[in-house]
Amino acid sequence: PKEVVYKKSSYDQSMINFSPPRKIYSPIIGVDLVRTGKDEFYVLEDNCRTPSGVSYMLENREIMMKMFPDLFHTNRVLRVDDYPTRLLQTLMSLAPKKCDSSIPTVVLLTPGHLNSAYYEHTFLSDQMGIEMVESQDLFVENDLLYMKTVDGPKKIDVVYRRIDDEFLDPLCFN
């Protein structure tokens, strides 16, 4: 019901009629499913804003495959170990068309080590081979986003934001 949507704190009326670049609204979504029967599933949570938990699934699968290899082979369980590669490909596909190089610079923006999903942030950035940055590592110059590095500023093409909306504004310390 629309009343439920309108009462949500994350509902932003200014987004009505907003058209994002290339009409890509949500390139990454997390959906938690619960199997309740042979052919019955329920959505426990769907998260478009900051999905998390995939690193635990990947680590769990790796351990389970080592412990029970026959179980996976016999039941033809699909592999998931290519998730970081596919995630990186998705992120790179979001780079602006006027990218300076053929390989876009992608970073993962984390709120820091106190965040409950920090392990996942480090895991994913490591698996994708990208830099993990915090807000203090970034600056804007001539309408372009840069990260500070030991070799000097490096332009960023894509930010994989793992930080909630309310923590984005550095002037509003929530």
What do these predicted ranges mean?
Residues 1-174:
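Domain-scale recognition of functional cores that engage charged ligands
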